[in-house]
A protein has these predicted regions:
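ATP-dependent carboxylate-amine ligase
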Residues: 8, 20, 28-31, 35, ...
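Short beta-strand elements of ligand-binding domains
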Residues: 1-5
Length: 218
């Protein structure tokens, strides 16, 4: 197994977390000890990299050769996966494709660790998908951020206003005094967060990731 649990055969330990990368050490049987970093934010991303390395070793690749190949970091570009799109000035901005409660939890925790100021979250929920997870997503978003901006994603054939209301009501129930805004067009929602944020703050645009389209009634 590869995890961070005490009884695992392989362990991923985080050695550094910055807005630009996460450094880790992978320790395993027979003294295997591999150090590297991923150009992604979050311990969960380092754990994914560790699992990939374990799979290579279990497939017969030499651990020392793997270490030599990735000693200076793993070169990867994954659009929309805690992707940092920060400009030269202003707040840190991250785009993440995750659209589940677990994804929200991990990504918000990662952003919080590297943010000195407030954490803004701009998010919505897809239409014609599992509606039962929407209240939980909104609860996690509310508990993990300082300012929420609820917007539309891909409403498909659902009423986007109804989706937003479900998210808004669940967020208010979780944290009644939280600063929450409802802005339907995603472009306007992002602009709202940028206008409110200050240097030292961070904005997480969660859900559609790198997608540059919207699915509205097909």
């Amino acid at each position: 197994t590869s995890q961070m649990g005490v009884d695992a055969d392989w362990h991923v330990g985080i050695t550094a977390e910055t807005p630009a990368y996460t450094s880790f050490v992978l320790a395993g049987p027979e003294g295997v000890n591999i150090r590297s970093r991923v150009p992604l934010l979050g311990a969960h991303m380092a754990a994914n990299a560790g699992l990939a390395i374990v799979m290579l070793i279990e497939a017969g690749f030499d651990a020392e050769r793997i270490q030599a190949a990735i000693a200076n970091g793993i070169d990867a570009y994954l659009p929309g996966r805690t992707e940092r799109v920060t400009g030269e000035t202003g707040p840190d901005v991250y785009v993440d494709f995750g659209h589940s409660p677990d994804a929200f939890l991990n990504t918000l925790a990662a952003v919080r660790k590297v943010t000195e100021g407030r954490v803004f979250m701009v998010f919505g929920a897809d239409g014609d998908r599992d509606a039962s997870k929407r209240p939980e997503m909104a609860r996690i978003a509310a508990e993990g951020s300082d300012v929420l901006v609820i917007t539309d994603h891909h409403p498909r054939f659902e009423d986007p206003a109804s989706i937003r209301k479900t998210l808004f009501d669940a967020a208010v129930a979780a944290r009644p005094n939280l600063e929450i805004y409802e802005v339907s067009p995603p472009e306007a929602a992002i602009r709202k967060a940028v206008a409110l944020a200050q240097p030292g703050d961070a904005i997480l645009w969660a859900g559609p990731g790198h997608q540059d389209y919207r699915d509205i009634r097909g």
